[in-house]
Amino acid sequence: METTTKKARSLYIPYAGPVLLEFPLLNKGSAFSVEERRNFNLSGLLPEVVESIEEQAERAWLQYQGFKTEIDKHIYLRNIQDTNETLFYRLVQNHLEEMMPVIYTPTVGAACERFSEIYRRARGVFISYPNRHNMDDILQNVPNHNIKVIVVTDGERILGLGDQGIGGMGIPIGKLSLYTACGGISPAYTLPVVLDVGTNNQQLLNDPLYMGWRHPRITDDEYYAFVDEFIQAVKQRWPDILLQFEDFAQKNAMPLLTRYRDEICSFNDDIQGTAAVTVGTLIAASRAAGSQLSEQKIVFLGAGSAGCGIAEQIIAQTQREGLSEDAARQNVFMVDRFGLLTDRMPNLLPFQAKLVQKCDNLQHWDTENDVLSLLDVVRNVKPDILIGVSGQTGLFTEEIIREMHKHCPRPIVMPLSNPTSRVEATPQDIIAWTEGNALVATGSPFSPVIWKDKIYPIAQCNNAYIFPGIGLGVIASGASRITDEMLMSASETLAKHSPLVNNGEGLVLPALKDIQVVSRAIAFAVGKMAQQQGVAVKTSAEALQQAIDDNFWKPEYRDYRRTSI
């Protein structure tokens, strides 16, 4: 963790007594000094000893270790977050590799499923459809006036778990925790939001503890009008906001991104963030093998908005490497539950239509099947890269992986579905089926694989390598939009930090302990590209770096001075 080179300015605080202790952004707990306890009416409300934040963090770490299940650890950390945010982030940064899977995937999935059961205290904004006409008033109720990043979900497609209704709030909370822990964005600048448009999850509707609007999901024109009211209210309240769409259903994710990306500074992490980290990983893996991404044939299992978003960014990258658009598209094969996407397949979604293969080019394939399965595609394409974004467990079978390995000595296999229970194949199986020759990157965290007395580290293709840096870059540069080129610059920067590329060994992605360094580098690349593209005011490189440093928040207590409201 970086240390400050100069003492931070004092904060002037209008709150005192129990009110101050109940304010998570300002509460220091036992770390309030003797003078602060006297000035803020805290004398006698805290134990005698004045502790440092490291002493507090050590106690919290010991308490954390006493919990045996991941969900109990998650609940404990969320309680600290809702009590003392500075301590929460110091603790998480001290133990990032241990705690990141607890505050986010995979544990956050269980927290979303059990949201109403484990609910302790409100965090963020809940906007239900019955309150749609009070949108402006609701946002005015947010006490933080300087919000810079919103993560919003409607809870319909939470990870691979489907419709979790209001329980989806766990995702924006977790995501914004990583914006701060990994990207240094002050928690005072962040706001999680859930749009409660009902739920089609009958189990939730029947649950007496369910805290959301008990109604089937609104759809079509009503739904889009509601989202539009929200967007307009956000623009009115915080005109310079960065808005991240998160875990919207496939039918809504791409239309919302397309509709609003040129109206408000926004992006969809499931589509664009996943694509950026995947492309960064593939660039690094290709370079480590002495080749380029444009030389690879790539097969996808899963042709939803996330899979197609990754495919389009791969195509853009291979065009940058010199391929024509037609040649780039001929190297990418999309398979969904109906088989390979072809130009004769009916009822394709608009974002799928550009990713079809021409049936005329498949006449020579060795198959008698009308529907071209994943095995058919792997057998005939002989891919170098296999990517899973299906949300269905076990679909990368032994037969498929062994067939791929027949024709590719060092296959790259990326089962990216979340959470762990939905992964297309486990790293252990993939390593065994390829005789230890596969390079594996997963969406959820996995322990290193031991096979024939050799240890194989498993890279987690985690969006947290990308979105915190993008957020920091947008804030530091004042970018008004997030362009495709800004996302590509993030991918390229991530690839440049690959230990496998730089050292010839190790993981294809940086260690999590280095994620703040990576986020700062991505922030600079994104901010610079924003300036080049005219969506941010041009400054010198030194000024941009200074803006990044100035906006990089550290979990350290500041001295307080008393003032009136």
Curated annotation (Swiss-Prot):
GO biological process entries: malate metabolic process
- Cystine connections: none
Keywords for the protein's UniProt record, in alphabetical order: Metal-binding, NAD, Oxidoreductase
Please tell me which top-level EC class this enzyme sits in.
oxidoreductase
Indicate whether NAD appears among the record's keywords. yes
Q: How is the cofactor bound?
A: Divalent metal cations. Prefers magnesium or manganese.
MF terms (GO), sorted A to Z: malate dehydrogenase (decarboxylating) (NAD+) activity; metal ion binding; NAD binding; oxaloacetate decarboxylase activity
- What GO terms fall under cellular component here? cytosol
Instruction: Identify the EC number(s).
Output: 1.1.1.38
Record has Oxidoreductase as a keyword:
yes
Cofactor dependence:
Mg(2+); Mn(2+)
Q: How does it assemble?
A: Homotetramer.
Q: What is this protein called?
A: NAD-dependent malic enzyme
Biological source species = Salmonella newport (strain SL254)
